[in-house]
Structures are given as C-alpha cells and as structure tokens.
Regions:
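Aromatic "clamp/platform" in nucleotide-sugar-dependent glycosyltransferases that forms part
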Residues: 392
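A conserved mid-protein helix/loop that constitutes part of the nucleotide-sugar donor-binding site
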Residues: 318-337, 351-354
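Short hydrophobic beta-strand element within catalytic cores of glycosyltransferases
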Residues: 409-413
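Nucleotide-activated donor-binding/catalytic signature segment of Leloir-type glycosyltransferases, i.e.
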Residues: 355-374
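A structural motif in glycosyltransferase catalytic domains
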Residues: 313, 327-332, 344, 447, ...
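A short, active-site helix/loop in glycosyltransferases that binds the activated sugar's phosphate group
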Residues: 258-287
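A short, well-ordered alpha-helix in the C-terminal region of glycosyltransferases
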Residues: 365, 453, 460-473
Length: 497
C-alpha cells in the first residue's frame, strides 16, 4: 500500500496545511507505511527547501512531471567533483565558495553557480548559468540531470524534464499568458490533461489511498474524481465547511457536489466530524465513512525552566484579517486597565502588521503590547502564563495544541472547532460565548473580563490541565490514531504493521 497526498502547494504563502502534511509524513513513516507527497507543479529551490525544513524527505516526494521520464530517484547524488569534471572546471575557475554555493567565473564574463544540498553533503541540488550576472538557465540534479529551466527577464518561460540519458521526455512552454505542454510528439493544451496522464502513470492499486488536502480550483481534482483505478479516495478537511448561517464554504462546493465519489472523509476534530455528518445528511450523502485524525502532533511536552513571568500572554499566527488579532489587542488593552502589569506579545508575520501596529499606537498600548515577528516558538511558549486567541474559527489550531503542550492557560471564543477542542471551560482556560451576530464590543468586553478572571485565579491547576489535555497529541498517540484508522478503512492489516 502507498498513501499519496495531493498536493504540496507551490506559489502560495506557507500555511497550516503544510505543517499538517509534514506531521502526516512523520506519522506514516513511524508506521512503516509507504507515502508519497505530490508536487503537481515544479517547486522553486526555496519552496522545496521549505518543505524539507518541515520534515519531509527527498525520497517521499513525488514530482508529477518526472513520472513521464525514466528517472529512478530525485535524491541529490551528483557530487561537486563529478560535476566539475563534466563541466571541465578547475579550482582556478572558483571565485567564491560558501557552505551553500560555489561560483565559477570564466574569461568571457559568464559564470556557473553550483548550489549545494544541505541534507546531502557535497552534493549539488541545482546549477545556475549566469550571463552578465543574469540567470539564463538552471539545471536540477538527482543521480543525473532531472530538469532544465530557461529564464527570460527573471522568469521561467520553458522547462524540460529529462530521461537519464539527458533526452527530453516532457516539456512546458509559456506562450503569452498560458502554458503549453509537450509529451512525446503530443501537445497538451491544459494542465488538467497533464494530471490525467500522470495518474495513469501511477498504476494505482486497490490497497492504495489518495488523500486530497484541497480540491477547489485544483487541476488534479477532476482527474482524481474520474479515475478508473480501484484505489481509495479521501478528502481531508482543513477549513470550516459549513458556516453558522448554513452556507457552504465555496472551497468545498466541488467536494459536496461530487461527495459520493469519495470513499472517506477526514476531519481534524471530533466536533467537525459531527457537523460534517449533519451537512452530508442534508446533501443526501449519508453513509460515507468519516474519520477524525489530528493534523498535528507534539514531540514532547515542554516544561517551563523557571517561574513564568507574571501577567504574560502571547498569541501566534499569520497576521491575517481572518485571525482577528485586532480584537486580541483591544481585549488586552481593556484588561490592562485592571491589570497594569499585563504584557501581550504577538508572534507572526503577515499583511496585517502595519494595521495592527497603528491600532496599538491608537490605543496607546506600546508599552504592553508588542509585535514580535516570526520566531521558533518551542522554547518561547513556556515563558508565558497564558495564550489568547481571537480567531473566529479554527478547524484544528496548531498553535493552541502547542501552547497546551507548554502548559499555558488558554482563552478564546467558543467557536468551531479548535477552541472547544483545546480549551476546556474552567479547567485549562475560559471560553467566551460566540456568535457571528454578536457585537464586537460585547465579545471584547467578555473576553477581557475572562482574562482578568484568569489572572485573579491560581494558575497552577490551569497549567496542569493543559499538560494533561496535550498528552493526547503526543506523536505516539497520534500515530496510533492513524494506525487504527487505516486498519478500520481496510487499507492496513495487522500483519503490515
């Protein structure tokens, strides 16, 4: 059995789905289950490095367009020495050398730059060809040349995918504002057809499982729904699928329209599973099995090394309007009137940063509320007493899980689905009643009152309750959920564990 994940997204900002996929990779790896994470478009070096930094491994990545070649591996194996010989380079040509790159300069002013792979010592990931300082071509390497990109005015206009002997198996070319694709002697005019051909190359079997993390406006969705192969197909929900007013999230319109073509649905929480069952019943699609699997895990519970600073609160997320961090700022500013030593730190980056900075200044709260930017939070969480979220819906809430794993008391709205999953009223924090129709002034006041109430309480029981809850999300426990789910699906027998 192989589990295929569609897809590792290229061309968009990092998000929680990326982290969820990396967690899944680790869980399946721990079970010894073969897994492939599919790039349906060729990633930039920066995007590939990002996914590898999350914990993905080269051998678990599947590049759709390379399926049309006879390449056996994409793991970097070409050494610097081997490529120097192929390019007939000498040490005298080297003009710059760092841990990550080697630059070779020629008498005519042209240059080559070898970019080394940090995970495979002395191996080259890609080579840039430079003309008068401008990149004109880039070659990617595994055991041999995999892909060549051609640049014009800093952008790729042609990309070729090679067989092991260097000949071209598949080609992408940009013509005006659209891309055309050449497979052998055949011209394909849309990427959906390319994905259809790719799926036929996979030779999917009945015991294989395909997981879709996204379907809306994805050119692989229709070919997957129409696939003749006997493999199973599951949709993983990462967002709210039905809003409080009963409207379906447009992101899942396609999924509900063709719901009966899915074998399984997967949610991140039991709460969303319950709501999804009701939604499917209203759509006349009862009977499709739904499983709840956490989309994140904790390697360990993080203890505080000393006393946590008193009256310390943080939040962490993308600085995005949907996260409503502006409400969190107003909550803390209001609570600060009764808790004059209250300190609130906001971690994360995003387009809302300037607006939030202006709001802090408008409220004259610069001394108590701070934008801290991006940071590795693992050792930061234990330096705080409480975590505040004002997001109005979270399908899981990775930072809530992490904060609970560091023993923080939690505060937020009683809104689907992550908050009531991780915040247990009066045990490890407080939930404020929430509805889309409630005035924001009321929401801010009630949450500010709860924040004051929290800091007037003995926090030790709250911290312990968070640790107790978070223990359910330790890697070994989440891995067991995956094991039980795959066995219940019939995709995994006991003898395969």
């Amino acid at each position: 059995m192989t589990i295929y994940t569609f897809n590792l997204l290229v061309g968009f900002e990092p998000n929680g789905v990326d982290v969820a996929q990396a967690s899944r990779a680790k869980m399946l790896r721990g079970l010894g289950v073969a897994a492939k994470f599919v790039f349906t478009t060729w990633p930039t070096p920066e995007k590939l490095a990002y996914y590898l930094s999350l914990g993905h491994r080269d051998e678990e990545l599947l590049f759709a367009h390379l399926a049309f070649t006879d390449q056996q591996t994409t793991v970097p194996q070409k050494t610097v020495g081997a490529l120097q010989m192929e390019f007939q380079l000498t040490r005298l040509d080297v003009v710059e050398k760092t841990e990550r790159a080697i630059r070779y300069q020629f008498a005519d002013g042209n240059a080559l730059s070898f970019h080394l792979d940090p995970y495979h010592p002395n191996c080259v990931r890609y080579v840039d060809y430079l003309l008068a300082g401008n990149r004109i071509k880039r070659e990617y390497y595994g055991a041999c040349k995999l892909v060549t990109e051609y640049f014009q005015y800093g952008s790729v206009f042609r990309r070729t995918y090679h067989h092991q002997d260097g000949t071209i198996a598949f080609e992408e070319s940009r013509l005006g504002g659209r891309w055309l694709y050449k497979l052998g002697s055949e011209i394909l005019t849309n990427h959906t057809e390319v994905m259809r051909r790719f799926l036929s190359q996979l030779s999917l079997k009945e015991e294989d499982l395909i997981l879709l993390d996204r379907a809306s406006r994805m050119d692989f969705a229709r070919p997957l729904l129409e696939k003749p192969a006997p493999s199973k197909l599951a949709m993983v929900f990462h967002s709210e699928h039905e809003f409080e007013n009963g409207h379906l999230n447009y992101e899942y319109y396609y999924v509900f329209k063709y719901a009966k073509r899915f074998d399984y649905f997967i949610t991140a929480t039991d709460l969303q599973k319950e709501v999804l069952e009701q939604t499917l019943a209203k759509q006349g699609c009862q009977g499709i099995p739904i499983y709840s699997i956490p989309v994140g895990h904790l390697e360990e519970l993080t203890e505080s090394l000393g006393d946590r600073p008193h009256f310390s609160v943080l939040t962490a997320s993308r600085l995005d309007p949907r996260k409503r961090i502006d409400l969190a700022i107003r909550v803390v500013a209001q609570a600060h009137e009764q808790l004059p030593t209250l300190q609130f730190d906001i971690y994360g980056k995003g387009g809302e940063a300037d607006n939030l900075r202006h709001l802090i200044q408008e409220l004259a709260a610069q001394d108590s509320i701070h934008l801290r930017g991006h940071a590795d939070l693992q050792q930061i969480y234990p330096c705080y007493q409480a975590y505040l979220t004002t997001s109005q819906w979270e399908t899981f809430g990775l930072t809530l899980m992490e904060a609970a794993g560091a023993g923080l008391a939690l505060l937020g709205f009683d809104a689907r689905y992550g908050n009531p999953t991780f915040i247990k009223e009066g045990e490890n924090g407080f939930l404020v009643p929430y509805s889309e129709t409630m005035p924001e002034e009321q929401l801010v006041k009630e949450l500010a009152d709860k924040l004051v109430q929290l800091f007037e309480s003995d926090l030790a029981p709250f911290h312990q309750a968070s640790y107790d809850l978070a223990s359910c999300y330790l890697a070994s426990n989440v891995q067991e959920v995956w094991k039980e789910t795959l066995m219940e699906m019939g995709q995994l027998g006991k003898k395969k564990i």
